């Protein structure tokens, strides 16, 4: 059994029009959401062993902000193809993962990360999954090796909105 966490980056700032899309940082609201999501991840089993993030500033800040709350923070690897990635790009990365990894997180952007979640769970992009900023989808994949990942093989174990976490903690 493999576990895949799909985390959409936290709320980004639009206060700096001179910055490119890839350079936009998190907004204060986005930064505030990260410790709460980190606490949720700390309680999950199995723990996240590696994080692959889009190189966009807001995605890297999201990944690094979340792991500050973890007792055993995983390595965060910038993966340039994840910037505005589509389903085939996410799948290519998934197929390349080392088989010894049991739980991996991807930090990325819509619409691609949302589409990948739908493709894994429903076998197609259905438009029925909503990954808002700082929302986490936890998927179980009943596979032994990551290269076995196919359309519809995933089971959505939890969809965790950051607003719900704030209300609970």
Each model region followed by its residue ranges:
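Charged phosphate-binding loop/patch that engages nucleotide di/tri-phosphates or the phosphate backbone
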Residues: 152-169
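Short, flexible helix/strand-to-coil boundary loops that buttress conserved ligand/catalytic motifs
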Residues: 18, 117-120
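Short phosphate-binding loop-to-helix
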Residues: 82-96
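Domain-level recognition of soluble alpha/beta enzyme cores
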Residues: 121-157
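Glycine-rich phosphate-binding loop signature in dinucleotide/nucleotide-binding domains
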Residues: 44-46, 97-102
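Residue-level preference for the first positions of well-ordered beta-strands
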Residues: 4, 103-105, 136
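Active-site-proximal alpha-helix that buttresses catalytic centers in soluble enzyme cores
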Residues: 2-81, 89, 113, 127, ...
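A glycine-rich beta-strand to alpha-helix segment
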Residues: 102-118
């Amino acid at each position: 059994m493999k576990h895949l966490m799909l985390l959409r980056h936290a709320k980004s700032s639009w206060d700096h029009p001179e910055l490119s899309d890839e350079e936009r940082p998190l907004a204060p609201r986005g930064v505030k959401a990260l410790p709460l999501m980190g606490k949720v991840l700390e309680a999950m089993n199995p723990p996240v062993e590696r994080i692959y993030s889009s190189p966009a500033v807001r995605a890297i800040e999201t990944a690094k902000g979340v792991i500050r709350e973890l007792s055993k923070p995983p390595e965060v690897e910038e993966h340039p193809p994840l910037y505005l990635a589509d389903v085939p790009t996410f799948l290519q990365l998934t197929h390349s993962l080392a088989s010894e990894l049991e739980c991996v997180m991807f930090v990325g952007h819509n619409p691609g990360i949302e589409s990948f979640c739908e493709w894994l769970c429903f076998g197609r992009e259905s438009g029925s999954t909503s990954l808002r900023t700082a929302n986490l989808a936890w998927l179980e994949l009943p596979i032994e090796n990551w290269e076995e990942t196919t359309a519809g093989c995933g089971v959505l174990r939890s969809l965790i909105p950051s607003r719900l976490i704030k209300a609970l903690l």
